[in-house]
Amino acid sequence: MIAHWEQGRATVDALISARRIERIPPNRDLADEYLRQARAHLATSLLAAGTDPVGEFQLAYDAARKALASILINQGLRPTSSGGHIAVYEAVLAQLDPPLGDVFKPFGWMRPLRDDSEYPSPDRPVASGEDAGAGRAAAAPMIERAAKLLDLMPVYGR
């Protein structure tokens, strides 16, 4: 494991200062549970393929979100209610892009589509079957990369 992680420190510190992310005791068991849930969500989304595009997409989105959150939980960080899902994305991306932006950046397009699907309106379409497939394809590498990162990234410290 790396002793001290510098990349993205200014962004994560700013998220903490703004109370969008908070420090918690690091919890590897909970991080592993989040990854287990992420894999289950992804598998369930695939089982539903072709039957419920919005539900399929939301499961793929939740799989991706829990993969990203597992990284933070393992570091002793979590989003606050005011930070929400976007704070998770910002904290992970700040620390891991580069080199892993290609793996984690798809969460950026998934989040607003999830919101549009959860709170639909006539001018914002909900997720389609194609979106669900793309969401599954994006979530799978996020889960696998997060699983590998848990052994590499240290507890977040000052």
Task: Describe these PLM feature segments.
Residues 1-158:
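Terminal alpha-helical segments
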